Amino acid sequence: MKKVLLKIDGMTCSACSSGLEKYLNKQDGIKTAVVNLVMNNANIEYDEKKLTLEQVEKFVEKAGFTSLGIDNFEKEEKKKSNEKYKLIGISVISILILYISMSHMVGLPVIPFLNMITHPINYAISLLILTTIVILFGKDIIKNGYKNLIHKTPNMDTLVMIGVLASYVYSIYGTIRILQGHTMYVEKLYYESAAIVIFFIKIGKFVESKNKDKTKEALQELMTITPNNATIIREGKEVVVTLDEIQKGDIVICKPGEKIAVDGEIIDGVTHINEAFITGESKPAKKEIGSKVIAGSINYEGTIKYKAEKIGKESTVSEIVRLVANATATKAPIAKIADKISGYFVPVVLVISIISFVLWLIISKDIALAINIFVSILVVACPCSLGLATPLAIVIASGNASRKGILVKTSEALENFHKAKTICFDKTGTLTKGTLSISKIYNYSNLEEKELLKNIASIEKKSEHPIARAIVNKAIEEKIEFEDLKEFKAIAGFGVEAIMKNDDKYLIGNRKLMTENGVIIPNEQDEQQLVNDGNSILFVSLNNKLVALIGVKDILKDNIENVIKELKDKNINVVMLTGDNEKTAEIVAKQIGIEKVIPNVTPKEKAEKIKELKKDGIVIMCGDGINDSISLVTADIGVSISSGTDIAMDSASVILMNDNIEKINELIEISEKTIKNIKQNLFWAFFYNICMIPIACGILENIGIEMNPMVAAFAMTISSLTVVLNALRLKK
């Protein structure tokens, strides 16, 4: 299976996006297709054995739309430029049409040879020519509307096409009658209605497009954040090159005030670097030899040299752009409801307009009035606002979150985050800083402590666990050299197993690892002492005999007590799920205000506990991603804490770009505001249609209130802009 994100041209409303989505999902070889109206893209997963990319793009074209290719911003910008010039042309001609057709109504000077009373033929022919030009400028609307009607996926363009052509064709009929001498038809021409409907729709789409671009600002900022050039060392000399010329393994030099060009690892120098755009943390981070640096971050102080590791699309920035773009390409449950409604909406409007046309034709015997009502219904009921209500808010909220160092990978996670009933936290590296240090070693072996530590550290060097790092750091401090191993095996949730070059077999991990392998633990008094002092305990066996207990202590994260208190104030059940022993877990839990502790659990057992908790409502699991992948997937929403450079964590639907757990409460607030905004948008979209469609049907005709197509087009434009502007409030 292969995934592509195609730029789509020609979508104007929710019926377009939902119609294209349905059509693509019916095609053999396409597994899933999610179409986003705001981002103008389609996220498609297809079987490479059955389809090529060209065939997928042909499906898009058959559905009545145009594929601009993968991330083809150049074509998109060119199209926007063309639309701008078209709009200028339509505006000038539409104003001229309005002047010719309505100047006599508002007391403006009438052009003598175009006077509808004295020169009806000139008047009709001039409006015919000018309106034809406007329709040609707006032919994309007519073309899209026709294609979607043929494919049985009628959309906003279909309604406009039928309305505009009905006015235009009837006006041509009127013009023919005028040429035949029936000058009374001069008052039954609707050329201006056809032209002004296209004018207002084009104006609305242009403003809407500009505002949509504002919603993508966070992504655009990220895409332009890296420098254009960098200084690298080639053949012993400093050379300035473009980013495209940098290769993996190149040594890059970054001076104070410059931006990091590509992701890498410092090999020389010490500095402080601002990574706020990635982590949301404004305080510069200290970087030294061995520290990772991220492209786009700013070097504050010293000159550093670093080895290029991730370039181009592999970089952290590119990964973030991809994740945020993919998040906006997913559908929130609330959006699926809106799409379902819009799927029925357009056909229902078509039926209502036809019934109204027939009824008014029978009642009034006036075909001009019946056409006026028919066109007004079609134009006023365009479902633009309905289609924009959800995706606009999702795009803005995803951008807001990414600015704060929070990557939300799915719209569903964003929608449901504030609905959580329970939040489960792993302990080490999540509630604590994960910067562990050895507090005590009980050595029961015949080896010297330094020799024993050398063997243990040589094994733990191959592990990613925070406790393993503490052991390795201790060995480095003691200037101990590491040994090579014969075999190494990580046992998730238990520890590690290794065989040294001399065939000695070591087991290093928790108590369960010892029990599972039949290792007797006679020194319970020492174990209890370590527990009472708040240590996590590492058990070490050599050839199935316990040879050491190592006590490791951690430091709580800053402000963690307030984070837990805020969550509890929101009536969220907070649980600690940890593989640590009960006593140590309870000491930490008591310090930070967590009442419910589930200790001594393996990754598999964590997942089982989460399944039980899910019976009471939505469960969020927050972990460091090392041992928590199963529980992150099992939870309704998995939150992973990233190192800043490793963000491609498939198991988590939310990634915190730094280790600040306060971001959890920030995301709850973003989620809450986003859903509130979506509900407001949907309310106004439905309220508008509920009010306007009956008026367009002529229910107020008896009291002298009627809606003509020009007013309908203006009202429809205002309705869409109301939704857009309301969504943009989320940026504040």
Where is each model-derived feature located?
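Conserved ATP-binding TGD loop and adjacent catalytic N/P-domain core of P-type ATPases
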Residues: 18, 330, 499-503, 534-536, ...
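Flexible metal-binding regulatory segments at protein termini and peripheral loops
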Residues: 1-122, 212, 237, 318, ...
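Conserved cytosolic catalytic loops of P-type ATPases
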Residues: 28-46, 54, 189-191, 220-314, ...
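Juxtamembrane coupling segments of multi-pass membrane pumps/enzymes
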Residues: 5, 192-256, 287, 337, ...
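Membrane-embedded alpha-helical bundles of multi-pass transporters
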Residues: 106-118, 150, 169, 400, ...
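Soluble-to-membrane junctions at the N-terminal ends of transmembrane alpha-helices
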Residues: 74-93, 144-167, 321-354, 374, ...
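ATP-driven catalytic headpiece of P-type ATPases
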Residues: 85, 297, 418-464, 494-575, ...
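Transmembrane helix-loop-helix hairpins at the membrane interface
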Residues: 82-229, 340
